[in-house]
């Protein structure tokens, strides 16, 4: 059965640390809801009501646009092994770019990966745990290295050109992204 909490406790933090992936959901007042899976060693608990995750450049930038427009975010962790458990973190967040105040403080918590474009700084309002009994059991095989390898080998100028269309969401919402933000001068 579902339980709600006002802050992360030690058991929650230990559960999060064991999960190899998590899911991020955001939406603006109008338009599409975005739901994205995330991997890598990219999530950090910064306090009982504060978390952050490192974001790499990819196919879109929906989370950024939605957080600028609305601020709401839900993160979900799921144990695909035993014991079954689902944990949702409800809150608000903001994108922090390399040129922003606060970048250095947040970046110090991570090994910055090639292609890092921002860190999402999230304040948690509530936490919900539920049984997860309807979720299948699966084993972790390995992290996919494709995205990091791509960014290691990418030509910065080509990346800037390719990323120019990612300064808006698929619904046309603006982000704070710039050519400099994507690695240009």
Question: Where are these predicted regions, by residue range?
Answer:
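Binding-site signature for planar aromatic cofactors or substrates
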Residues: 1-185
């Amino acid at each position: 059965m579902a339980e709600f909490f006002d802050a992360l406790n030690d058991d929650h933090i230990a559960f999060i640390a064991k999960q190899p992936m998590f899911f991020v959901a955001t939406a603006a007042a109008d338009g599409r809801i975005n739901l994205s899976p995330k991997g890598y060693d990219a999530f950090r608990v910064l306090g009982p009501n504060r978390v952050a995750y490192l974001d790499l450049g990819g196919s879109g930038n929906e989370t950024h646009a939605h957080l600028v427009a609305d601020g709401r975010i839900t993160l979900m962790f799921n144990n695909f092994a035993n014991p079954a458990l689902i944990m949702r973190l409800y809150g608000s967040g903001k994108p922090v770019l390399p040129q922003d105040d606060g970048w250095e403080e947040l970046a110090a918590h991570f090994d910055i990966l090639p292609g890092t474009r921002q860190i999402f700084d999230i304040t948690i309002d509530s936490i919900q745990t539920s049984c997860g009994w309807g979720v299948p059991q699966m084993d972790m095989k390995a992290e996919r290295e494709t995205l990091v390898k791509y960014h290691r080998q990418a030509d910065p100028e080509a990346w800037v050109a390719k990323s120019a269309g990612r300064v808006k969401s698929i619904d046309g919402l603006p982000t704070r992204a710039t050519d400099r933000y994507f690695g240009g001068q």
